[in-house]
Amino acid sequence: MACCHHLERHSTTNPNTTTTALTLVPPPFSPTPSPPTSACGDCWAVSAVMTATDRWCIAHNQTTNPRLSVESMVSCCKVCGYGCADGFPNYAWHWLAGQKGTPYGIPTGGNQDDRRWCTKYTLPFCNHYDTVNDTGLPSCESGPPDKTPTCPSTCDNDTTYPTPWAQDNHQFSSAYAVPADETTIMTEIYTHGPVTAGFNVYSDWIHYPVGTGADQIYRPQGGTEMGGHAVRIVGWGESKGMKKKYWWIANSFGEKWGLGGFFKMAKGVGAAGIEESVVAGLV
């Protein structure tokens, strides 16, 4: 099953030429959709693991498309931070690449009702902030945060996945920081696929795209700072007419939030520090 199709108007231009990526990158790709969300503070793991899922698919020329396990990262990577109580995307990438004394690799894992992979995501789903609530899910902010689940050591009993746990270990060869430079980040995405990034969350971002104007590009407008958040930058573009540049970013609040789970962030102007903490890795 191929991971993807092209990114439509997002990330279609080589950052160093005027030639389109759709003619230069065989074959063009689109990012894995944002998974449903829970009340676990695991954005650090979701952003890193979904970036890794995309990069695995791209590196294998879309001949293999495993969904890597967010829950295994959250529950097993003790050096990454505090599980559901926050963590660090750069250490998640160290875990994937076996750097800094961490184990090496990650198994596959799907959503709660997905038996195609080794493990399932066991935490209950909920809706964050202004997510369109047409599913009957509770608000993630209405109750206590989820506790970090137990690190699995076998595949689920009801899985249809044929690969045993010991062999279901997807390993990356490297993990690294991407310099805080607009063109360098674009080149990294163009060459290898999406990247993981952190930024400062302000209260006006929570209600995205409310208040962003016709172009729907988020620019901090002086709201209250609420802490950090990790996301997956999957491409870039320019608004029609106004020619304002933006990053096209996958959030971790599910497909009912923002623009189908994605949002636009002003590019090249240091908006919310989005270009300052970018990390990635190679298969």
Where are these regions (language model features)?
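Catalytic-core signature of thiol
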Residues: 1-283
